[in-house]
Amino acid sequence: GFFLRGAIPEPFTLYEAVRALPAGSFAWIDERGVSEPQAYASVAAILADAAEHPAQVSEAERQERIRAALVDSVRYHLVADVRVGAFLSSGRDSTSLVGLARDAGSVDLKTVTLGFAEYEGTVRDETPLAAEVAQHYGTDHATRMIDRSEFRAEFPRVLAAMDQPTVDGINSYFVSKAVADCGIKVALSGTGGDELLGGYSSFRAVPRLVRAAALPSRLPWLGDAAIKLYGALAPKRSVRISQKSGAKIKYGGSFAGAYFLKRGMFMPWELPELMGEAAARDGLSRLDILGVIGKALVPDPRQAFARMVALESTLYMRDQLLRDIDWAAMAHSLEVRVPLVEAHLLREIAPLLVATKGDRKRYLVASPSKPLPPHVAQRGKTGFNVPVRQWVLGDGKSKGPEFGMRGWARRLYEMAWRPEGGI
């Protein structure tokens, strides 16, 4: 699961005999043992109902209802007996969240931005825009810069806090440390905005691939032949062909398969090289990666946008982002709250979102009563640039085709999780 997706999908864990209780479910434990988990909540079910009953309202009413639901969620997440802080980058999610916190009544919000010495003075440096937004909304702001030497000194503690292997989370560890160093015990995060409002490129790429591969994917032999052809060509080219290229026909005809291609790191046939033939064969058989992904679409929302919200919210956000925030923040005794990840909020605005098209992030950006600065509101998605892979792997100029996330996954596994090693 880790090599295929960058994190271990629930209910699996790092330990063969241990299973996680799936999110949104419960189990009874008594003298007879442990019952099978029973689901009481489902992201897919909420979205399926929304797709069946879309809210056909005016654009003005849609905006106002979404704004009211967002402010309501933020207000509840601000309730605390200690001062509340917020992670602030220069992205639209966290900046909008700070504006909404102001509308929800926060008067002493502490905002913290994490910066990197290597990026200072470049377009990747988020600290100047974040500081501008903090001043715009009148928050008590702090900027925390880290460099390669501090990262390397802290890295053993990062690995010790990481309870299961994941290619993400290190950014959450350091921003949580920065917030905790300011004396904050509770902080808001904008996590969930991309999943809820279609901020990822996957919301366009996956449906497009499903349409393109619909007919050829009906011929199983064609997909296998394409994989073999690309595999034979790849070693002969000076520029490496992605292992995913030949798999588009095999997997691209379904939302589960196309999503796996979009989010996957390694393909199943690459695993024997990484972990041995027997372990790879046994792991793939028990995991059933397409089955795991397919469960996120039960019941099926039957609409492209709603399906993607279900997939990204269930598989990427829940299995990876939220888990990473949890272990990373708890390493610093910090409670992180995510107002955009809320079942009641999803029920309120899903019928409004499925009934419209285009950039749905516009509703979040337009929600603060004091508008974001125009150059922030109109800023495209850049992601949170973190140089940690460069700090571990080097500058990447001579590292070959796997300097990126794949190379980082290999290195992380070798450093901390290889069976004969370990932390």
Please give the residue ranges for each predicted region.
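Short catalytic/ligand-binding loop motif for oxyanion handling, primarily in non-cytosolic enzymes
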Residues: S94-L97, R152, E195-G199, R204, ...
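Active-site adenylate/phosphate-handling loop in enzymes that bind or generate adenylated species
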Residues: F174-R237, L322-L345
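A glycine-rich phosphate-binding loop feature that marks nucleotide/adenosyl-phosphate handling sites
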Residues: S90, G192, G383-P387
